[in-house]
Amino acid sequence: LGARVLIVDSIQTMHSERIESAPGAVSQLRECTAELVRFAKASGTAVLLVGHVTKEGQIAGPRVLEHMVDTVLYFESDTGSRFRVLRSVKNRFGAANEIGVFAMAEQGLREVTNPSAIFLSRHAKPVSGSVITVMREGTRSLLIEVQVLADLSLGGNPRRVAVGIDANRLTMLLAVAHRHAGLLLGGQDVFANVVGGVRLAETAGDLAIVLAARSSLQDVPLPNSLIAFGELGLAGEIRPVPFGEERLREAAKHGFKLALVPEANVPKRPPQGMTVRGVTRLNQALDAF
């Protein structure tokens, strides 16, 4: 073909005469993908295979397609949002879990060079139940806003609703906060949300979630200049998280002046203009404000 890039949309519609089955069958997927892989290796052409996905967002059909290719990328979007996230879940030649953020404009998709700007909302005045944390996506540090609303439950069983946060982990964090910090949320409906539609999959956001819950319960805003990260253990200890210095540098770059982090994540030289407080216990973190 003489082309540098070949895009096949979609691989489920491809058909090989060597296989007596309908397009989309497992045998057809395996044979067509193998033929395209051989072509890519022999010609040096970059081949992009577009695959169907299920309602759950996974590649449709058996995982044979994922096993045969070098890289698997998911193109994700939320209904009504102009932003799209390109996420790598497999990469034989580099780091997985990398993301690229794009915005849909009149001219088509355009790269968002500063993803933290779309996930982060800076309130003009501090509001209760809102805390900024720093999550890692591949090699990127992203600032995101965690919001928690605690409201008096009018039913017999208080609700626990989590959007962008694992619901089981939210329940566990509230139990730890009650046991080790005396946070009385048993009669409260608790709603937790990550702003911007992003999913907080790592434990580094634990401390921010509990701080936001206490802030909402007492209706006491935390400083606008604060960021917090750290994993919370069942014994009420604040455990260190990977890439602490990188997280702090990203926060300082966006103008945050105060950080509440695990003691083990306190750097010898904090970023210029930032005060970093280290904590080892949950009650120590809550007493800081």
State the predicted function of each range:
Residues 1-5, 11-289:
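Peripheral, non-AAA+ core regions of ATP-driven protein-machinery
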